[in-house]
Amino acid sequence: MDKQAAERRIQELHKEINRHNYLYYVEDRPEINDAEYDLLLRELQQLEKAYPDLVTADSPTQRVGAAPLEKFSQVTHRMPMLSLENAFNEEEMHDFDERIKRFLGLAAGDEIEYVCEPKMDGLAVELVYENGDFTVGSTRGDGYVGEDVTQNLRTVKTIPLSLAIATPPRLFEVRGEVYLGLAPFQKLNVEREEAGDPPFANPRNAAAGSLRQLDSRITARRPLSIFCYAAGSLEGHEFTSQSDLLNTIPGWGLPVNPLIRKVSGIGGVLAYYHEMSEKRESLPYEIDGVVVKVDSFDLQRELGEKTRSPRWAIAWKFPPRQAVTVVEEIVPQVGRTGVITPVAHLRPVEVSGVMVSRATLHNWEEMEKKDIRKGDTVVVERAGDVIPAVVKVITEKRKGDEQPLPIPANCPECGSEVVKIPGEVAVRCLGLSCPAQIRETIIHFASRHAMDIDGMGDKYIEQLLKLGLVKNVADLYYLKKDDFMRFERMGDKLAENLLGAIETSKQRELSRFIYALGIRHVGEHTAKLLANAFGSMENLEHASEEELLSIREVGPQVAQSIRTFFHNRNNIEVIDRMFNAGVKPSVEEKRVGGRFTGKTFVFTGALTRFTRDDAKRMVENEGGHAAGSVSKKTDFVVAGAEAGSKLDKARQLGVKVLTEDEFLAMLGVCRT
């Protein structure tokens, strides 16, 4: 290919890859699978390698991160990024509304048009676009001067490197909130704890810590996202209102929270706040309140600013998700990788409608830093963690008999030596045959998202270990009915059901099998990437580090962990024993041209004909996409019993609603 043809193809690839990035990261409705995406990216990389002078700053290949910086330089904001005044109750919101009316000379009965937005709990940033190209990105800082984090922001997949508009503004400063979703946050903390690093306290700290990395390659490995919500300086374009801005910029490629809404009067604001308060627990990211802004930019200019905040906006904060209780015991808990975690057993207390009786203390360094002891009165919080965390000790309530828990010299499960590896915060059991590690490994292997051995719960696994019937996951596939009949209160039918569930699990998808192996740093998503890339266990076992690193989202740490796992002879022997017992993982290809190609489904309510995981698989196998929330882009909502807000929204948007039987009929499955 000559240079002219290469340049044309590079431009085509830019457009195609950017479009797929937008579909994948912003709209959550990919049109191609990861393997097809990787082929496009690899083609672009090869062309740029052949013609390095054709590499442009907005190329999709330039998101991988640059060499580490020694320190961040400073950026002065052309327009200050002011903080917002806070409100904490309805009375203060009524006061805000009345102040605006008085300032504008309006009558008490007049209604202001407001725009209400979920208050994201992340890190505020400013993106500068010059003639449509992203040139500078900075943190809010003190509102006047922030830190230059351009290289890090370039790695955030939801930030366009160039605006999708034919005639872009000469200058456009857009403000937004960089955040980390709850699922990526929990996964990141698991990986950090397994690697011996301190976990992040909450998603906001994780987002801030990820964005303020001097090495942007670290930022690139963390799935940060952004929602844009305001404009700074603007030349060459004009918006008339906040709603005009937020309705326009998604078409330019800038993500906006779909829950933003224009309302009339303070009554509309109150209704929106209470709706978001109810939705808060079901959202895939953290919000800590609602931001309310006067919609009209003319009115905003008339209202102006106070010393540190605008008169035309306010943040109505949610009540904190905290409670006070007592630490009744601190117990060391051994995980499947040998990491020993101190866990606080608490006097039961309700936090955000959930009864809490345990909280992770993460590690001994964290516990000692907070000085948490048995008998302490503490503040606990639910902030993105499945298991709540202890925020602080109320030291003034100490009586003098509180007891700290020292690092155990020996594993509480097997008595093996316990070590703290230099450079890590984790304390680990070195026992190769530690029953706690074996137990947790088998529980993980049999779990619903792994091999899904129906009925094989924790109690049965503990009995198998106690009776010496299993020593590793391969032993599950050599069990006989007589083995289960040794259990307490075990009948013929139940034993046969368990054996049947084990037999059924032999045909699970390759991605589930990879995830079930419990390879360090390999979660469900990475397991799917590996299954799609290599297609068989044999190929994965023999994959080189270079081949692993060529996969999108697989970094050096993950690649090294995979290589280490497959270099362990014991692991290979366990896998071989499973294959000899008839385990045969299958690769389920996403069908191109399936009956659901290009269609988006949402499942809601209590499903009786299939599980949500089964539904997602059925849709994806037919080329469709299963989403978690209803939007204008949703094609079908499948509603089970007691369907709630998703069903209501589907009806409001005119989305077609199906029963479970109607969905199965679309698949050609007979009703029973």
Swiss-Prot record:
Keywords: DNA damage, DNA repair, DNA replication, Ligase, Magnesium, Manganese, Metal-binding, NAD, Zinc. Its EC number is 6.5.1.2. The active site is at K119 (n6-amp-lysine intermediate). GO terms for molecular function: DNA binding; DNA ligase (NAD+) activity; metal ion binding. The gene is ligA. It comes from Geotalea uraniireducens (strain Rf4). The keyword Ribonucleoprotein does not apply. It is an enzyme of class 6 (ligase). It catalyses: NAD(+) + (deoxyribonucleotide)n-3'-hydroxyl + 5'-phospho-(deoxyribonucleotide)m = (deoxyribonucleotide)n+m + AMP + beta-nicotinamide D-nucleotide. Coiled coil: none annotated. Zn(2+) binds at C411, C414, C429, C434. Belongs to the NAD-dependent DNA ligase family. LigA subfamily. NAD(+) binds at D34, A35, E36, Y37, D38, S83, L84, E117, R140, E177, K293, K317. This is DNA ligase. One of its GO terms (biological process) is DNA repair. DNA ligase that catalyzes the formation of phosphodiester linkages between 5'-phosphoryl and 3'-hydroxyl groups in double-stranded DNA using NAD as a coenzyme and as the energy source for the reaction. It is essential for DNA replication and repair of damaged DNA. Its cofactor is Mg(2+); Mn(2+).
